Amino acid sequence: MNRGIPFRHLLLVLQLALLPAVTQGKKVVLGKKGDTVELTCNASQKKNTQFHWKNSNQIKILGIQGLFLTKGPSKLSDRADSRKSLWDQGCFSMIIKNLKIEDSDTYICEVENKKEEVELLVFGLTANSDTHLLEGQSLTLTLESPPGSSPSVKCRSPGGKNIQGGRTISVPQLERQDSGTWTCTVSQDQKTVEFKIDIVVLAFQKASSTVYKKEGEQVEFSFPLAFTLEKLTGSGELWWQAERASSSKSWITFDLKNKEVSVKRVTQDPKLQMGKKLPLHLTLPQALPQYAGSGNLTLALEAKTGKLHQEVNLVVMRATQFQENLTCEVWGPTSPKLTLSLKLENKGATVSKQAKAVWVLNPEAGMWQCLLSDSGQVLLESNIKVVPTWPTPVQPMALIVLGGVAGLLLFTGLGIFFCVRCRHRRRQAERMSQIKRLLSEKKTCQCPHRFQKTCSPI
């Protein structure tokens, strides 16, 4: 009885010695769906030797027979391979291409009477909807994972936004700075795998912009897009709310096809001009107070729900002098913090207010500056020259004309004076002659037919 015990122990030791391999600790490798993974298996000696790769069901995937690579009847036979150039170095890794979630399994490498187990976990991260989304829409990322796993996901946007989640990550209200490559890290069993997802946020580069112009200047509006697409088709419209108007109106409508712009309809007042190529570009011939206000450009893209929006503002400045009053005014949407001032060149501000109109009574002669500023930064400037009101400089031609008129008046006056004087003298001479004639006549009746009977010569 006692003699049988050592024999059984000897038999057990013999069986263990005859085992083809000794199982070592299991390694965990994370892979990405659609990607390629390499499962390593190294021999203790750097030489070519026999090895076999099997799955958890002991089905052969690939191995070496003589000097040739052989494959078994597994589902990976057409996607599995090994680096033959590294066999002489004792490296017998297995490469699996175009990974699938169902490739997640425990794989066994048998080499030099030992076994190496590698647990492969394949994950996939995809966007539930199109990766081209309008600004303000939501983004949802879904993680595909093998059964039994409990991964965690952390994503970082191009703008530095960090979002954590499990099998689903939701990003509401996408912003233009979210456009670009998102980096998502999947963690499982202290191992990580990184995903790169390109998200395109369809938006204009700016949410709003303000153009500052002096009255009469040409105005340029630009609406650059924050993305590029091979084919871009859609339609757009610019609605404008003038500060002086009671309601908004459509200034222009246009079509966009393969990055070329064609105008459909445009108002006659003002008559905008539009560029034929991207970026969208509008020209207003003159900046006038009646055009100052705010506009909203919308762009509807083909096969997309919703529209792109950009707000644009126009501020117009006018500097005028009327009689003894110098005035500076602005029209359009301005912040209450903006300062409007009037100053004589090379001197301090005469008047400065947080208002839309300032004025100076009886301004000094010289070059005056009308300035619209924001915290000391000049946004808009208009110059106006004030000339002395008295004495007014007289031009040489005016002097000649005035001299001629004065000479003519003087000559005419002298002529009239001498004519009147000559006539007066003639009448006076006639009267004196008549008096002398009467005195020289005899005292006879002035009317002979009446005094004939009483009058006789002496």
From Swiss-Prot:
One GO biological process term: T cell differentiation
UniProt topology in membrane: Single-pass type I membrane protein
PTM note: Palmitoylation and association with LCK contribute to the enrichment of CD4 in lipid rafts.
Extracellular side: 26-396
Ranges per topology, Cytoplasmic: 419-458
Keywords: Adaptive immunity, Cell membrane, Disulfide bond, Glycoprotein, Immunity, Immunoglobulin domain, Lipoprotein, Membrane, Palmitate, Phosphoprotein, Repeat, Signal, Transmembrane, Transmembrane helix
Every Ig-like C2-type domain range: 126-203, 204-317, 318-374
In-chain residues carrying the UniProt-annotated modification Phosphoserine: S433, S440, S456
Signal sequence range: 1-25
Lipid-modified sites (S-palmitoyl cysteine): C419, C422
Ig-like V-type domain boundaries: 26-125
Record-level GO cellular component terms: cell surface; plasma membrane
CDD domains: CD4_CD, IgV_3_CD4
Subcellular location as annotated: Cell membrane
Disulfide bonds: C41-C109, C155-C184, C328-C370
Annotated transmembrane regions: 397-418
Keyword Acyltransferase attached: no
SMART domains for this protein: IG, IGv
A GO molecular function held by the record: coreceptor activity
Glycan-modified residues: N296, N325
Domains (record comment): The Ig-like V-type domain mediates the interaction with MHCII.
PANTHER family for the chain: T-CELL SURFACE GLYCOPROTEIN CD4
Function noted in UniProt: Integral membrane glycoprotein that plays an essential role in the immune response and serves multiple functions in responses against both external and internal offenses. In T-cells, functions primarily as a coreceptor for MHC class II molecule:peptide complex. The antigens presented by class II peptides are derived from extracellular proteins while class I peptides are derived from cytosolic proteins. Interacts simultaneously with the T-cell receptor (TCR) and the MHC class II presented by antigen presenting cells (APCs).
Name used for this protein in its record: T-cell surface glycoprotein CD4
